[in-house]
Every structure is written in C-alpha cells, then in structure tokens.
Curated annotation (Swiss-Prot):
Transmembrane segments: none annotated. GO terms for cellular component: cytosolic large ribosomal subunit. Keywords: Ribonucleoprotein, Ribosomal protein. This is Large ribosomal subunit protein bL27. The gene is rpmA.
Amino acid sequence: MLNLNLANLQFMAHKKGGGSTSNGRDSQAKRLGAKAADGQTVSGGSILYRQRGTKIYPGANVGRGGDDTLYAKVEGVVRFERKGRDKKQVSVYPIAK
C-alpha cells in the first residue's frame, strides 16, 4: 500500500497549493535631506538638514541633534559651503540690523 502522507500530493486539483513568500513588506520613507535652501532666511531652532551620519557637517551657528539632524542656533541666512576638499558644511549667518 502507498503511503500518501510522505509526498504532499494533490490529486485532481485545478490549482496547486500556493507557497508562501518572505517578501511583501517595505519600510516607510524617512524624509531625509535638505529642509532649508541656500540663501533662505530661517529662525533659531529651524531644521536645516535631516541625515543619517554626518553627510553634511555643522558650521557656524548650526547644532547637531542626537539623530545627526542639523538645526539653526540663531536667526539668519543659510549657506551650504565646502569644508576642505571632500566635505560639506552648512552655516547660518545672522542678518545685520
């Protein structure tokens, strides 16, 4: 006598049993990148750049948060600048009144 339990056979099935997949998920976008443009006037505490790691370094009057977000410490004009040959920084220069 045949043991049919060994080989999960499906006789006379029009559609065979579908397997499962380990795909079908995706994480939400984190909305990283520049939040203020070069030359834009910002107030103190405004977020300038959201990033993972130090893609852009903080310059004058710019702070770095715990998640590497760059923010303005004072009200002023945003400037994206080079820092040496291979690095970039963002600074905020106060507006002269």
